[in-house]
Amino acid sequence: MAAVPVLLVVHHTASPALHSLFDAVMTGAREGAAADPATPVDVVARPALTAGAVDVLEADAYILGTPANLGYMSGALKHFFDQIYYPCLEATVRRPFGCYIHGNNDTTGALRSIQAATTGLKWELAQPPLEVIGPPTKENLEAAWELGAALAARLTLE
């Protein structure tokens, strides 16, 4: 683990609903990271199309955010996994992650595709996936905040 643990949020924020979820995740992560000044956590956000292997290797935990597009994760998040898979395969085994997915009708295929990629990388699910259908509710945004806060807090314990 790095001297100061790093939480990397990789996202494809293509809609107002995803932007709301991303903001809530980031707020929770930053507040969770700042909860104990003795154990700081750096929270880094990268769009899925620009995040790369160096970002992943320098991080200690991950949050993945994507729309559910045509029964799959976004092409941007798929591109991210394609770019990082082999360079990060051995070095990131058992790293904790969480994810949030927004869909208008269904998120099943998007979640399944994320699970396939993260299983291949041997990452460990640290929080239940957050799946949101339709406009995010207050409860959805609170769950997104909790996702960010929980992953950041987990890094203060390691």
What residue spans do the PLM features occupy?
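Hydrophobic residues within alpha-helices
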Residues: 21-29, 114, 147, 151
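Short helix-loop-beta junction
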Residues: 23-39, 119-124
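Glycine-rich phosphate/pyrophosphate-binding loop and the adjoining helix
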Residues: 36-37, 52, 124-158
